Amino acid sequence: MSASAVFILDVKGKPLISRNYKGDVAMSKIEHFMPLLVQREEEGALAPLLSHGQVHFLWIKHSNLYLVATTSKNANASLVYSFLYKTIEVFCEYFKELEEESIRDNFVIVYELLDELMDFGFPQTTDSKILQEYITQQSNKLETGKSRVPPTVTNAVSWRSEGIKYKKNEVFIDVIESVNLLVNANGSVLLSEIVGTIKLKVFLSGMPELRLGLNDRVLFELTGRSKNKSVELEDVKFHQCVRLSRFDNDRTISFIPPDGDFELMSYRLSTQVKPLIWIESVIEKFSHSRVEIMVKAKGQFKKQSVANGVEISVPVPSDADSPRFKTSVGSAKYVPERNVVIWSIKSFPGGKEYLMRAHFGLPSVEKEEVEGRPPIGVKFEIPYFTVSGIQVRYMKIIEKSGYQALPWVRYITQSGDYQLRTS
């Protein structure tokens, strides 16, 4: 089962607009939502699902609005939340910003969209490009589209319009990998994960078919266990344009792309990644009069690669003052509102090792709890490099007019949630 009704509430919990899909939950039940939300917030027990008797409220907050779905059955919660987020995405496509004013100014279109987005409590058409074929907006009024069959009915490509033309046909491919890392105070890696995306920026005429080939080292989770030095990708998700049947057969990623920017695929890699930037720190206090901090940073990636925009955030006591710094490279500054020293290194080549020393006065005699000390955080970006070793082997562009197109590939490895605890 899915949603019985969907409400859009203002910040005070007053319904701006609602749609009853099944009629099995009284619309007046929404009056219990805001008092329940406030109560749970005060108790520190706020949850994305709230219940009042037999009625369940599944909600999300966006700007100054609450989107709430009600149900009295054992609903598929993940489906409902996915629908609510997709609804926000569609509204933002139509109104640029989703807020109370845009709902009030466009309530006719909002009602039309709610009718098309869900049918009898189940998500129906949530692709904004399909919806824009027959629900159009001009001067806050609803227009009826031309009398023709929607593309979805004719099996046409809903995510790409016909007749697109460019003087120069190009495709830009970005392979971006974010490294999530957590190291404890003893230097042991507690969490190591790579989250990757392949993003495309497409400037191609006509209705081209693209075929993307990845290097032979890459295996997908469906193929079984990895062998030798191959990379096994997990949680692989594709854009709807990818022909999954073709992929299941021969692992070719074949698709007719949307125009412009889109995310072709995402993946995750749970593996023991060697920390790309290793941090060693010594923090010493002297009779509650001063604190000395020494931080050593080492680039543990290939010497031919360079990390750009490196920022190392080192926590300091909240009552520290009179900062003095000495760095072997880059610059350091004290950010008192965050209680950190930020050591910035513009360019950090692989294999290099740098040092930063900081001195602070400690006017207070309060004892700081060691276990409450935040970790050191690191930000960086390494171009022309992927941790997993994934590479685009080829990109074939096939279009009936036979034009030549240029594919450009860029690789970026960047920090995600990258933290090292201090002793």
From Swiss-Prot:
GO terms for molecular function: clathrin adaptor activity. It is found in: Golgi apparatus; Cytoplasmic vesicle, Clathrin-coated vesicle membrane. It comes from the Eukaryota. Its main location: Golgi. PROSITE patterns: CLAT_ADAPTOR_M_1, CLAT_ADAPTOR_M_2, MHD. The keyword Transport applies. Residues 168-421 form the MHD domain. The keyword Transport applies. Keywords: Cytoplasmic vesicle, Golgi apparatus, Membrane, Phosphoprotein, Protein transport, Transport. One of its GO terms (cellular component) is cytosol. InterPro entries: Adaptor_comp_med_subunit, AP2_Mu_C_sf, AP_mu_sigma_su, Clathrin_mu, Clathrin_mu_CS, Longin-like_dom_sf, MHD. Phosphorylation of membrane-bound AP1M1/AP1M2 increases its affinity for sorting signals. GO terms for biological process: basolateral protein secretion; intracellular protein transport; protein targeting; vesicle targeting; vesicle-mediated transport. It is a peripheral membrane protein. Adaptor protein complex 1 (AP-1) is a heterotetramer composed of two large adaptins (gamma-type subunit AP1G1 and beta-type subunit AP1B1), a medium adaptin (mu-type subunit AP1M1 or AP1M2) and a small adaptin (sigma-type subunit AP1S1 or AP1S2 or AP1S3). Interacts with P2X4. Belongs to the adaptor complexes medium subunit family. Subunit of clathrin-associated adaptor protein complex 1 that plays a role in protein sorting in the trans-Golgi network (TGN) and endosomes. The AP complexes mediate the recruitment of clathrin to membranes and the recognition of sorting signals within the cytosolic tails of transmembrane cargo molecules. This is AP-1 complex subunit mu-2.
